[in-house]
C-alpha cells in the first residue's frame, strides 16, 4: 500500500515539474513576443547600425553536375547566425532556459538567398526551427537542395575540371543594413574564420563522377557598387571539382580510338575484293554516331570544341581522305592499256624506287626455265621430222593410207612422184603448202605476244595500285598515332590549379587556419 502511494506521489511530482517547465517556456515566449511587442518585420538594430550575418556551408552530397543544363545540384546545410537584441532574457528569471526553439517564421530573418540558382527558387524550401540563446544570438541551420548555375568549360572533356560556385546574398537589405561575413570558430581560445566549405566525413556521400579539389569560401565586396545596393556584397562558396574520366575512357574514348585505327586496315584489303570503300565509309558512319552521342552529353556552346570532339573531327577528316584514296587506288587498279598508258617515269617510281623504299616484295623476272628449253628443243625435232615425212608422202596417201589397207589393197611399193628436192618447182610447191601454216603460226604468236604485253601492262597498273596502298598506309598510320597522342596529351596536362585563387598562396583548408 505504501509503495503505491509513493508511486503516485512521484508521478504527481513529475507532472508538476513538467507543467512548471512548460509554463516557464510559455512565459518566456509571451515575454519576448507580447510584452516586448516583438515585430519580425523590423531589423534587430538601430537605424544607422548594421546587423552582422555570419554564414557557413556544410556539404552533405554533391548530387550531380548536368553539363547540358549547366546546373550543379548539391545537398547542403546553410548555417546562419546573427544577434537580435530584442530576443535577450535572463535565464534565471525563466527557469534557467538556455535555448529557445521557435519556428523560423516567428522571428526576423536576413532573407539570404542563392543568387545563381538555376530553378527559379531563390529561398530555402524547408524552414526548420531557429535556436535562440539568452544573449540574443540566433542560430539557424536549414537544409536545402540547391540547383545552382555552373558555367561549363568543355575544352578538355572528358579530362576537364570545373569551377562552380554558390553565391549567397540578401536581395532585401543593403550593405548599410546588414553585413555579411564568414562564420567565426574557436580553437584553443583563438578565433578564426571558416574560409572553406565544411564537409562532415561521416555524413558526406562521395560523387562517382566528380572529385572535389578545392572548396574555398570568400566574402566579396565590390567597391564600385553603391552602398545602398544589395549587389555590393555577397558570400561565395566555391567548388573546384575534377572529373573522374574512367567511365568515359572505357565507354567512349577506347571504342572511338579502336574504330578510328581500323581505317588502316583498308590499305590491307585487296582492290579486287570490292570492300575497300565500304569499310572506310562504315568507319566514317561509326565516328558520326559517336560524335552525335557526345553532342547530346555536352551543352550547345560555340565557345570551345571538346577534346574528344577534336579527335573525332580529326578522325573523320582522315577517314574522308582515305575514302578519296580508295577511289583513286581502285581507279588505278582497274586501268588497262587500252584506256591508259603507263609512262616510264611512273613505272620507275612506283615499280622500282618506292617498292624498294617500302620493302615491298617484287615479282621475279620472267625467264625461260631449263625444262622449257628442253621442251622447246624436243618440239623442234618433232617439227623437222614431220616436215620430212610430209615431203615424202602424197596428199592421197596421207588422207587414205589406212583406208586402203582396210580394203585389202597392197601398200604402195613406190614412193610418190615428186620433183627433185633441189628443183625450183619443188620449193614453190613446198612454200605454197607451208605458207598458210606459217601465217597461222605467226598470227598465233603475235596474238600471244600482244596478249602477254597487255596482261603485263595491266599487272603493272595493279602493282602501282598496291604501291599507292602501301605508301598511304605508311603515311596515314603515323599521322593517326601522332594526332591521337597530341590531342589526348592536352587533356593529361590539364590539371586544376594548386591553389584556389591565382596569386593567393592561401590553401583555404582546415589545416591552414588564419587565426584572428
UniProtKB/Swiss-Prot annotation:
Glycosylation sites: 96, 163
Name of encoding gene: CHRND
Protein name: Acetylcholine receptor subunit delta
GO molecular function term, any single one: acetylcholine receptor activity
Function of the molecule: After binding acetylcholine, the AChR responds by an extensive change in conformation that affects all subunits and leads to opening of an ion-conducting channel across the plasma membrane.
Annotated disulfide bonds: 150-164
GO biological process, one term: acetylcholine receptor signaling pathway
Keyword list, A-Z: Cell membrane, Disulfide bond, Glycoprotein, Ion channel, Ion transport, Ligand-gated ion channel, Membrane, Phosphoprotein, Postsynaptic cell membrane, Receptor, Signal, Synapse, Transmembrane, Transmembrane helix, Transport
CDD domains to which the protein is assigned, alphabetical: LGIC_TM_nAChR (cd19064)
Locations listed in the record: Postsynaptic cell membrane; Cell membrane
Record organism: Bos taurus
Family per similarity comment: Belongs to the ligand-gated ion channel (TC 1.A.9) family. Acetylcholine receptor (TC 1.A.9.1) subfamily. Delta/CHRND sub-subfamily.
Topology, Cytoplasmic side: 333-470
Enzymatic reactions: K(+)(in) = K(+)(out); Na(+)(in) = Na(+)(out)
Regions that span the bilayer: 245-269, 279-296, 311-332, 471-493
